[in-house]
Regions:
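Conserved internal helical-beta-strand scaffold that buttresses enzyme catalytic cores
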Residues: 1-133
Length: 133
């Protein structure tokens, strides 16, 4: 199921899927049915814990994996054509060099996993000013 006819978005999703090779692609549609399915999956892995319904109805505790949340300074880069644009306290790398490194890292990175596509609009849908992703 695809939730857009925007050829640029569809092309990008296809390119990322070809690169990362997920077992499945799920487009998030915002439905209650899909929300409940995702909650059930997350509770099954222990990521999501349903709290006491009497005291906190409809509430959950979500814990992120400790390996997913911290920024590692020595692996954080400002990518620009000119090194001086990164500033004196930042790591710098040429964008083309970084893209090459990242494509190597991402190649096959989603094997055995599900890719979730979450459509969004920055701005009113249909507006000349809206940006879609």
């Amino acid at each position: 199921m695809k939730l857009t006819d925007n050829v640029h978005i569809l092309k990008w999703v296809d390119e990322m899927a070809a690169l990362t090779k997920p077992d499945e692609i799920v487009w998030i549609d915002g439905s209650e049915e899909q929300l409940e399915k995702l909650r059930h999956e997350a509770m099954g892995t222990g990521e999501l814990i349903k709290l006491n319904e009497e005291k906190l109805p409809g509430c959950y505790l979500h814990r992120s994996d400790v390996n997913d949340v911290a920024r590692v300074e020595d692996r954080t880069f400002i990518c620009s054509k000119r090194k001086e644009d990164a500033g004196p306290t930042n790591n710098w790398m040429d964008p083309e060099e970084m893209y090459k490194k990242l494509y190597e890292i991402y190649d096959g990175s989603m094997k055995g996993r599900t890719m979730y596509v979450i459509p969004y609009s920055m701005g009113v849908v249909g507006s000349d000013f809206a940006k879609y992703g």
